[in-house]
Structures are given as C-alpha cells and as structure tokens.
From Swiss-Prot:
InterPro entries: Class_I_gatase-like (IPR029062), CTP_synthase (IPR004468), CTP_synthase_N (IPR017456), GATASE (IPR017926), GATase1_CTP_Synthase (IPR033828), P-loop_NTPase (IPR027417). CTPSs have evolved a hybrid strategy for distinguishing between UTP and CTP. The overlapping regions of the product feedback inhibitory and substrate sites recognize a common feature in both compounds, the triphosphate moiety. To differentiate isosteric substrate and product pyrimidine rings, an additional pocket far from the expected kinase/ligase catalytic site, specifically recognizes the cytosine and ribose portions of the product inhibitor. Residues 560-586 are annotated as: Disordered. It comes from Mycobacterium tuberculosis (strain CDC 1551 / Oshkosh). This is CTP synthase. UTP binds at S20, K199, T200, K201, P202, T203, Q204, K235. HAMAP family: PyrG (MF_01227).
Length: 586
C-alpha cells in the first residue's frame, strides 16, 4: 500500500542533456534552497557514474575538489553546493558512485546473499541504487523525515555510464507512484550567432532520448546565454510534451546566488509544489536579498592571492574560493581571487612579482612535493611584509616549516616531501605509517571528518571564533611533530589550538605583536562556510586584508632576502597592530 501523497517523502530527480557542465548541481541546489525557504525539509543526493569508489584518490585537475562531510565521507564538489545552499550538513550517503554500488553488489555475491542468482545490472545493480536513493528519505539524526529528496544524476542522458542510474530512477517512480516523483531535465539551448537564432532541436533530441528509456520529464530547465522567448518555450513544450508552466528559461546569471531568484521568477518552485501536492508557505527573501545585495553592492574590494598547485582548474579549490567570497560578504567587500601558481614563488623575486599587489595570502591544502617550496616562499614573503596569511591543512604545515627554518633548522621539512630529512617538523601520523609505506589502501584511510579542538583563550583564533571549543572537518595523514614544538616556538609561532588531549596541533598563529595576521589550521574550515553564515576564520582573514589595504598595517621595509635562503627571525618584527574585532565588521 502506497502512502498518501501528502505524507510521503517526495523524490525529485535532476538529469542533464546535450552537454555536460550546464549547472545541474547549481540548479538542484537553488531549487532546494527555494523549497527550504518555503518551509519544507529538503535533503539532496548526487549519483556519480564513475567507477571510483569515491573521489578521494582522483586527480584534482580531472575531478576538482574533494568535499568532506561531517561523518568523514570524501564526496563530489556538488555536495558542497548542496550544503551551502541548503545551509544544512549532509551525510556521506549524499554521494553515490558506480564504484560503491558495484563494490557492494560484488561483496554480496561473494557472501552468497543472492542465493545463486546470475548477478546482472538489472535487477541487482539497479536495486542497490534504488536502496540508496530511498534511504535518503529516512529520518535524520534529529528524527526529522525530509519532505523532499532532490537527487542529481551525474553525466549526460545518452552516456552508457548513466543508464543504470536513470533506470533506477524510473523504477523509483514506478515503485512510489507518479504523484510522489518529479523529473527535472536540464538542457542546452544554443545560440547560433551567424543566423541570430536559438536552436531547440538539441533539447528535443535530448528529451526523446530520455523518453526512450521510459522517463518523461515534468519540467525542463533551458540553459542559454540569454532569455528564451515565450514562443520558443511554447514550441519546446509542444514538441517535448511538457506543461508550458514547466518550461523554465535560465539565462546565465551574474552570480550563482542569483539563480534561486531566476528560478522563482520563472515559478519553478510553485510548479513543483503544485505537481507534488506539497504543503508550503510564501518565500521569505529577507536573508537571501541581504546576501545578494552584499554580492552586487560591495563597499570595497580586496585582492587575495590563492597560492596553490592546481590553480589552472579553479574547481580544485571551489569551497576555498566560496568561503573567501563569503568572508568578504560579511564585510560588504568583494574578494578578488588572484590565482597564483606556487612554483613561481620559490624565489623572493618570484614571490614579489606574484604577491606585490595583493592584500592577503591564502595557502590551501594539497598533496605531494611539487610547489611546496613556492608555498613556503610565499609565506616568508608575506610574513616579512606584514601581509595577512591564512594556511589550511598543508598551509599550516608550510607555516610551521617556514618558522622552523627561520630559527636555524635549515633542513626542516615534512616527512611527506623528504622522508630522509634530519628535521621532520611535520611527521606521519602513527596510524598512517602503514598506509604511507604502501602496505594498505590509500582510498578512504586519511584522518577524515569532524574532530574537536580546544583553543587558547587569548589567541587570535579564539577571538575569531568567539569560543575556545570548536569542531572542524579534516583530511590529512601528517601532523606537527611534537618533538620540535619548543624549538619552533622560538620563532614566535604559537600553537594556539590542539586536539582535546593536547597531542595534535590544530591551530598555529603569530601573536599580533609579531605579525598582524598569520593563522594556520590543520582542518578544512572552508567546508563549513555558508554564504549567509561565513566561517569566522575567513571573516577574520578578509578583515585583516581590508585593514592591510587601508594602510592600518603598513608593510615593513626590510633588506632583500637572498635567493633560496630561509627567512630569518629578524624579518618578523616591526608590525604591532592588534587584530580588529571581526564581529564589529559587516
């Protein structure tokens, strides 16, 4: 017996056609945000058609960033969009890959759970996909059952890899009933400049391919660089057999935070609510309108250098970039991100050329030796000149290495980059040694997920957080070597936050009388930032960059540092302005 449609959890599937990178994830996130502000409890899920179990071991140039959830899952970057737009933490089950599905099915076959059946894509693979989709409708940790589950199906209709997921979605509709399932298809409407025409044929073919596997979309998102005229929307509705109210024009928006308003203007949320018989309230735009005003009407602009090794693909640092921008929103400031390849900062002259006109330096996470000396060089340059610095994960480790070299440990390094270094100020975590030695799987074995930390009460980070008890998400195998803490402290660097047992260094900083703002964290705070609730560390960092730009913290004139020479302690002094209270801004 099926549940009554007013009490059942509704499922909304988002597919894509014609081309990839049309913005399915942002469309799904924006619709989720719209339904949330209408008073509905929404959760989201991404189905990825690749055979990797998760993106944790994938090349950032191919996949982009790895988004880590509170429970320690390494997931697709779209899950980050979901969390930021819904303003809700999602579980690891919000990302399903073909690799996970096949691994589970094969493990069941080996255990004999299929009782001798011939294991096939249909029904065994599709049944496992359905199980994972339907599991998202279970109550969350607080006992709240979602009103709507939005599931984004990765890939493009017609891809071989996506077929099992589309078939599973079709079967979910058959199982739950048409009144409880909604299909939203995102398609490209290209503009041909020579003829001055918008072309609907690609969308017609894409919908035909979808219908050939048994799925008729309830609504179409038409992606274009301009508004699709009403006449063309009527034509598409007729040829694709879709209600005219379900044909949605979504021209390119100036900001991703404008997309919910675009969908609302086209009344997509109202159409979904009517079609699924959902309870609702009117949209309260107060908070989102304030965000959009901050996005489009900044009072000032600051330039932040993001010094990384994957800067050719900005998606590799997607959450970092969004957290920086959100930190700017708090101050009504626009953050211009300068993408700086770390290789170019190994020398003082290279660092000066890359960082000479920025107001802050951010060192993001990463792996491998390439570009490390450039990150350390960028920190040395910034520290000598009073530039604010924020280091994330590997960024903290680079701050520690630079500090160690400045007090005489000239060969200080990380065991990751130089296993034979005489001064491994960054060491392999004890439970990771077997993995680093190649004796265990790399995937899913790092220190992952949310862990607590205790901050020193009078520290810069405690001032930023406005508390001494924090919890952040992590993804690392290496830690500060406690045997070197006392020596490193001679540089002035302070270990201002640790794990509750005091063993693992979680935060480092220079006191305000040594440098206006140099903060490093072993965590990935960018993963918890929201556009309407920016992360306190990013708020404080952008605030320090604004002060630097305003001339409140003047650069220190120092003699030229010889090339390839570690930064000395004499280059640290001369700046003594305390960090302004971040809460007083914005």
């Amino acid at each position: 017996m099926r549940k009554h449609p007013q009490t059942a959890t509704k499922h909304l599937f988002v597919s894509g056609g014609v081309a990839s990178s049309l913005g399915k994830g942002l469309t799904a996130s924006s619709l989720g945000q719209l339904l949330t502000v209408r008073g509905l409890h929404v959760t989201m899920q991404k189905l990825d058609p690749y055979l990797n179990v998760d993106p944790g071991t994938m090349n950032p140039f191919q996949h982009g960033e790895v988004f880590v959830t509170e429970d320690g899952a390494e997931t697709d970057l779209d899950v980050g969009h979901y969390e930021r737009f819904l303003d809700r933490n999602l579980p690891g089950s919000a990302n399903v890959t073909t690799g996970q599905v096949y691994s589970t099915v094969i493990a069941k076959e080996r255990r004999g759970e299929y009782l001798g059946d011939t294991v096939q894509v249909i029904p065994h693979i599709t049944d496992e996909i359905k199980r994972r989709i339907l599991a998202m409708a279970q109550p969350d940790a607080d006992g709240n059952r979602p009103d709507v589950v939005i599931t984004e199906i990765g890939g493009t209709v017609g891809d071989i890899e996506s077929q099992p997921f589309l078939e599973a979605a079709r079967q979910v509709r058959h199982y739950l009933g048409r009144e409880d399932v909604f299909f939203l298809h995102v398609s490209l409407v290209p503009y041909l400049a020579p003829s001055g025409e918008l072309k609907t044929k690609p969308t017609q073919h894409s919908v035909a391919a979808l219908r050939s596997i048994g799925i008729t979309p309830d609504a179409l998102i038409l992606r274009c660089d301009r508004d699709v005229p009403e006449a063309l929307k009527n034509k598409i509705a007729l040829m694709c057999d879709v209600d005219i109210d379900g044909v949605i024009s979504t021209p390119d928006a100036p900001s991703i935070y404008d997309i919910p308003k675009v969908l609302h203007r086209e009344e997509l949320d109202a159409f979904v609510v009517r079609r699924l018989n959902l309870p609702f309230r009117d949209v309260d735009w107060t908070e989102w309108d304030d965000l959009v005003r901050r996005v489009h009407e900044p009072h000032e602009t600051v330039r932040i250098a993001l010094v990384g090794k994957y800067v050719e693909l900005s998606d590799a640092y997607l959450s970092v970039a969004e957290a920086l921008r959100a930190g700017g929103f708090k101050h009504r400031a626009k953050v211009e991100i300068c993408w700086v390849a770390s290789d170019g900062c190994e020398t003082t002259s290279g660092a000066a050329a890359a960082l000479g006109d920025v107001h802050g330096v951010l060192i993001p996470g990463g792996f491998g030796i390439r570009g490390i000396e450039g990150k350390i060089g960028a920190i040395a340059y910034a520290r000598a000149r009073g530039l604010p610095v924020l280091g994330l994960c590997l960024g903290l480790q680079c701050i520690v290495i630079e500090a160690a070299r400045s007090v005489g440990l000239t060969n200080a390094n990380s065991a990751e980059f130089d296993p034979d270094t005489p001064d491994p100020v960054i060491a392999t975590m004890p439970d990771q040694e077997e993995i680093v030695a190649g004796e265990a799987d790399l995937g899913g074995t790092m220190r992952l997920g949310s862990y607590p930390a205790v901050l020193e009460p009078d520290s810069v980070v405690a001032q930023a957080y406005q508390t001494t008890q924090v919890s952040e998400r992590h993804r690392h195998r290496y830690e500060v070597n406690n045997a070197y803490r006392d020596k490193i402290a001679e540089s002035g660097l302070r270990f201002s936050g640790t794990s509750p047992d005091g063993h693992l260094v979680e935060f480092v900083e220079y006191p305000p009388d040594r440098h206006p703002f140099v903060v490093g964290t072993q965590a990935h705070p960018e993963l918890k930032s929201r556009p309407t609730r920016p992360h306190p560390l990013f708020v404080a960092f952008v605030g320090a960059a604004i002060d630097y730009k305003a001339g409140e913290l003047l650069p220190v004139e120092i003699p030229e540092i010889p090339e390839h020479t570690p930064n000395g302690s004499s280059h640290r002094d001369g700046v003594g302005q305390p960090l302004p209270e971040p809460a007083s801004r914005g």
